[in-house]
């Protein structure tokens, strides 16, 4: 009991010198453990008279409490220092720019298709689709394209065999629709088409959209008004538009539509015409009762004109520097 103060002082000195939590725990065991110096002081109580034991026990407990408080204080200091050191090692320079989240965007051709579908959807047109591997009847014969027509030549069309081919136009969708339902018909048919050609303004695969109306009392005036409104809506300009007489086997009369470019020159944008009576007969629709108009346009060409793209192949090269311009 006489050297109790010395034990407390010794314990506090050891505590203050502990450099980490592990060393501090060794000090705790040395002084407060089961066989620690201060714990063993309790065994000396039995040597005292009974009436002195409570007071002596209180003194020992007070000494142990002082050491425990010193341990707690030092442990808090060491843990705080360790935390500060870890935080310093993990410091983040908040002035550095964060990682950018790259948002995707629609392909410019997809944007064009969506824009056109939206316009014609408001006019009551529905979207129709068909197979890309087509037979010669739906791609040619039913559309009033005879066997000797140049479009059937190998250098223009990808043939699988004598009767199957990659469709050269989405007009086959019109034939399938007219075979499946009677007028009134009002559809647009977007999709991929294939032609054996590749240069700055042509690719072997491109996107086309065709439109078809079949009903009673449909005239060329209806066709002109519809396309006139469409082109001004698509280009968002009060464009000068002209219709030039042309020839397509599946329409009569036929026309090609031009718009005046910013350079003062006419630019061809689409082809159109009144559905040929032979086409209506091929799908069992009476041309004496019903009439209709059809139009077809290349999605890549319209996209090029709208955004000022000069090379059609840019749409298929997957160059992000090009595609990001259309987000």
Swiss-Prot record:
<feature type="binding site">
    <location>
        <position position="252"/>
    </location>
    <ligand>
        <name>Mg(2+)</name>
    </ligand>
</feature>
<keyword id="KW-0067">ATP-binding</keyword>
<keyword id="KW-0436">Ligase</keyword>
<keyword id="KW-0547">Nucleotide-binding</keyword>
<keyword id="KW-0479">Metal-binding</keyword>
<dbReference type="GO" id="GO:0000287">
    <property type="term" value="F:magnesium ion binding"/>
</dbReference>
<dbReference type="GO" id="GO:0006432">
    <property type="term" value="P:phenylalanyl-tRNA aminoacylation"/>
</dbReference>
<dbReference type="InterPro" id="IPR010978">
    <property type="entry name" value="tRNA-bd_arm"/>
</dbReference>
<protein>
    <recommendedName>
        <fullName>Phenylalanine--tRNA ligase alpha subunit</fullName>
        <ecNumber>6.1.1.20</ecNumber>
    </recommendedName>
</protein>
<dbReference type="InterPro" id="IPR006195">
    <property type="entry name" value="aa-tRNA-synth_II"/>
</dbReference>
<dbReference type="InterPro" id="IPR045864">
    <property type="entry name" value="aa-tRNA-synth_II/BPL/LPL"/>
</dbReference>
<comment type="subunit">
    <text>Tetramer of two alpha and two beta subunits.</text>
</comment>
<dbReference type="Pfam" id="PF01409">
    <property type="entry name" value="tRNA-synt_2d"/>
</dbReference>
<dbReference type="InterPro" id="IPR004529">
    <property type="entry name" value="Phe-tRNA-synth_IIc_asu"/>
</dbReference>
<keyword id="KW-0030">Aminoacyl-tRNA synthetase</keyword>
<dbReference type="Pfam" id="PF02912">
    <property type="entry name" value="Phe_tRNA-synt_N"/>
</dbReference>
<dbReference type="InterPro" id="IPR002319">
    <property type="entry name" value="Phenylalanyl-tRNA_Synthase"/>
</dbReference>
<dbReference type="GO" id="GO:0000049">
    <property type="term" value="F:tRNA binding"/>
</dbReference>
<comment type="similarity">
    <text>Belongs to the class-II aminoacyl-tRNA synthetase family. Phe-tRNA synthetase alpha subunit type 1 subfamily.</text>
</comment>
<keyword id="KW-0963">Cytoplasm</keyword>
<keyword id="KW-0648">Protein biosynthesis</keyword>
<keyword id="KW-0460">Magnesium</keyword>
<dbReference type="GO" id="GO:0004826">
    <property type="term" value="F:phenylalanine-tRNA ligase activity"/>
</dbReference>
<dbReference type="InterPro" id="IPR022911">
    <property type="entry name" value="Phe_tRNA_ligase_alpha1_bac"/>
</dbReference>
<dbReference type="GO" id="GO:0005524">
    <property type="term" value="F:ATP binding"/>
</dbReference>
<dbReference type="InterPro" id="IPR004188">
    <property type="entry name" value="Phe-tRNA_ligase_II_N"/>
</dbReference>
<dbReference type="GO" id="GO:0005737">
    <property type="term" value="C:cytoplasm"/>
</dbReference>
């Amino acid at each position: 009991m006489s050297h109790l103060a010395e034990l407390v002082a010794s314990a506090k000195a050891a505590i203050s010198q502990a450099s980490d939590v592990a060393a501090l725990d060794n000090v705790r065991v040395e002084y407060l453990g089961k066989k620690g110096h201060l714990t063993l002081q309790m065994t000396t109580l039995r040597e005292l008279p009974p009436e002195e034991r409570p007071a002596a026990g209180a003194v020992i407990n007070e000494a142990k409490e002082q050491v425990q408080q010193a341990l707690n204080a030092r442990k808090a200091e060491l843990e705080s220092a360790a935390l500060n050191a870890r935080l310093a090692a993990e410091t983040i320079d908040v002035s550095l720019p964060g990682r950018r989240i790259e948002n995707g965007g629609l392909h410019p051709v997809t944007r064009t298709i969506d824009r056109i579908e939206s316009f014609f959807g408001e006019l009551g047109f529905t979207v129709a689709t068909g197979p890309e591997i087509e037979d010669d009847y739906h791609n040619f014969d039913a559309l009033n394209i005879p066997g000797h027509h140049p479009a059937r030549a190998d250098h223009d069309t990808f043939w699988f065999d004598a009767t199957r081919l990659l469709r050269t136009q989405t007009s086959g969708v019109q034939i399938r629709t007219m075979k499946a339902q009677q007028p009134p018909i009002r559809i647009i048919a977007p999709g991929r088409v294939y032609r054996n050609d590749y240069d700055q303004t042509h690719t072997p695969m491109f996107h086309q959209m065709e439109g078809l109306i079949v009903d009673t009392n449909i005239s060329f005036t209806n066709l002109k008004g519809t396309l006139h409104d469409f082109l001004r809506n698509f280009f968002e300009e009060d464009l000068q538009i002209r219709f030039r007489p042309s020839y397509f086997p599946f329409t009569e009369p036929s026309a090609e539509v031009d718009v005046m470019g910013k350079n003062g020159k006419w630019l061809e944008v689409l082809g159109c015409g009144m559905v040929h009576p032979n086409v209506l007969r091929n799908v069992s629709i009476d041309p004496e009762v019903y009439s209709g108009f059809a139009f077809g346009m290349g999605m890549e060409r319209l996209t090029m004109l709208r955004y000022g793209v000069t090379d059609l192949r840019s749409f298929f090269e997957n160059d992000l520097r090009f595609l990001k311009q259309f987000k």
